[in-house]
Each structure stands twice: as C-alpha cells, then as structure tokens.
Amino acid sequence: MSRFSFLSVPMLVVAAAVLPGISIAGWEVDPTHTHIGFQVSHLKLTKTPGIFKRFESTLVFDEQAIEKSSVKFVIDATSIDTAHEGRDKDLQGPDWFSAAAHPTITFASSKVRPAGGNKYWIDGDLTLRGKAIPVTFSAVLTNRTDHPWHKIPAVGIAATTTIKRSAFGMTQHLGAISDDVTLSVALERRSLEARVLATPVLPSPP
C-alpha cells in the first residue's frame, strides 16, 4: 500500500500517484510553479483570468484504496489578483466574493474516484459566500519525474471544474460576464528527500 498525507501552503487540491520505488515521507509544494486561478468570459470576446495568491490545503491519498483518499483546501478571498487593482477591489465586495463577511473559499472532498490511467475525479463541496454546493474536479497527474536541478522526485498535477457563479449569489452583470466560471489548479510538488539521480544534472535552474 502507498499512502501519504500533506499539510501545505500553498495548496494541493488533487491526488498524485506514488513515484515507483521511492519513499514519500515528506513532500513540499514548489510555490513558483503552483497556481490556483479562474477564467470567465467577458462579452464573449475574451476570457479574463485571475489567480489567488494565498491558500492552504491538506491531502490524504491511498493508491491501493482510493476510497480512503481526501482533499481539503482553503483560499484567502482577499488574495485575488486579476492584474487590475480596481477590479480586484470590486470582486472582494458584496456583489461578488463578499470577502468581509466570508473571507475564505473552501473545498472539502467527499470522494476521490479513479477515471482511468493518470486521471481522477474529485467530488466535494465548494463553499463560497457562505454557501456550499457540490462540485467535481477533473484531475490529471501530468508527470512524475526526477527533478534535474534539485535531485529529488517531483510530480505535476492539474485540475479543473466549472461552476455557475449565480448559484452562489453572484448575479451581477449576467450576460456581459459569463455565468460559467472555470476554476483551475496547476501544481508542482517535490520530495523533501534528496537522492542521486541517474540522469545528468543541468547547469542551473530556470
């Protein structure tokens, strides 16, 4: 059986399979290659992106007994960044995230299911503006490899889901701004245990 747990900042929102033949007693997030964000359509012309800069998470993943796996994450709603200061302030206000009354956005899984190969379904409740609604993330283990600069095992994970913002009470400018919002996670984790790689070490990190 392969089983591990994480408590980390920033967040982990999806499960990763165990790298073969190694111990995973400790893993850490690579914060420079980890992102949580969203996209929303503007006038059906472009998709406006945004990210959250502060988040926490816990994960338990059991490769041999998926039903024992679980995921939870907490996002600081005030850490939103859409590259527009005025818009960020509006999004924290009462028409949108209502961050003063509801400072966090949370997800707690109820089930992690295999979807074939390197893919998983993660079911759970997303709580936004104090309202919890069931959602399902589609997660992919993008790669597992030896990190060429740090000489340690690493995994990459991506996960997405689409929500209706109106379901959470965010009905401002429906039509001009799409009701559908895509939430996404790009994550890189690496082992805390250094080990010698069979592959050559590159001269310097990117």
Segments (PLM) and residue ranges:
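Bacterial N-terminal signal peptides that target proteins for export
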Residues: 1-11
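Low-complexity, acidic/polar, glycine-enriched regions of mature
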Residues: 21-206
